[in-house]
Amino acid sequence: MTIGVVGRKAGMTRIFTEEGVSIPVTVIEIEPNRVTQFKTEETDGYRAVQVTVGERRASRVTAAQAGHFAKANVAAGRTVMEFRLEEGEYQAGDLINAEIFAAGQLVDVTGQSKGKGFQGTIKRWNFRGQDNTHGNSVSHRVPGSIGQCQTPGRVFKGKKMSGHMGAERVTVQSLEVVRVDAERNLLLVKGAVPGATGGNLVVRPAAKARG
């Protein structure tokens, strides 16, 4: 079953094994994922479950969204996500939490990376930079040539140049679930995950582990 959950990044810490080995972990708070719609092949052409998490003020909810949430008899959430479903059944109003994962399981975590603003090619693309001396002045961190001459007479698409860095959708694959705290709805995942503390995260079973 490929269903995932939506959570928040609570921060990083470390835990120790019985042998005294320190493991860096990210704490992910899995808020109750409320099912807003269950899609089937007969009605929608594919099987999926749609969920919402968190809360949103009524003044921030459109009439269409309010009707959709009311039909499912759930409170309006801050975001809506959909997960493909290979097996199993869900009903509108059901709750999905951290218990669908187990310690030792591999997961993929998706989030929005931290925004870095406008950055040059050295920070953004790891360019090496030019000489500090030997006749070079005021060109130490410039990218250099960005193309050829009259032929082709343009800069190719995808050329690595200065620009906005970060604030992108990033997925880190095959992270190990070290511990599941069902009482507090927490997942402890080995290693770092994208985004700032408090940011939304989507946790799914690892695609590569599914074969």
Swiss-Prot record:
<comment type="function">
    <text>One of the primary rRNA binding proteins, it binds directly near the 3'-end of the 23S rRNA, where it nucleates assembly of the 50S subunit.</text>
</comment>
<keyword id="KW-0488">Methylation</keyword>
<keyword id="KW-0689">Ribosomal protein</keyword>
<dbReference type="GO" id="GO:0006412">
    <property type="term" value="P:translation"/>
</dbReference>
<keyword id="KW-0694">RNA-binding</keyword>
<dbReference type="GO" id="GO:0019843">
    <property type="term" value="F:rRNA binding"/>
</dbReference>
<dbReference type="InterPro" id="IPR009000">
    <property type="entry name" value="Transl_B-barrel_sf"/>
</dbReference>
<keyword id="KW-0699">rRNA-binding</keyword>
<protein>
    <recommendedName>
        <fullName>Large ribosomal subunit protein uL3</fullName>
    </recommendedName>
</protein>
<dbReference type="InterPro" id="IPR019926">
    <property type="entry name" value="Ribosomal_uL3_CS"/>
</dbReference>
<comment type="subunit">
    <text>Part of the 50S ribosomal subunit. Forms a cluster with proteins L14 and L19.</text>
</comment>
<dbReference type="GO" id="GO:0003735">
    <property type="term" value="F:structural constituent of ribosome"/>
</dbReference>
<dbReference type="Pfam" id="PF00297">
    <property type="entry name" value="Ribosomal_L3"/>
</dbReference>
<keyword id="KW-0687">Ribonucleoprotein</keyword>
<dbReference type="InterPro" id="IPR000597">
    <property type="entry name" value="Ribosomal_uL3"/>
</dbReference>
<comment type="similarity">
    <text>Belongs to the universal ribosomal protein uL3 family.</text>
</comment>
<feature type="modified residue" description="N5-methylglutamine">
    <location>
        <position position="150"/>
    </location>
</feature>
<dbReference type="GO" id="GO:0022625">
    <property type="term" value="C:cytosolic large ribosomal subunit"/>
</dbReference>
<dbReference type="InterPro" id="IPR019927">
    <property type="entry name" value="Ribosomal_uL3_bac/org-type"/>
</dbReference>
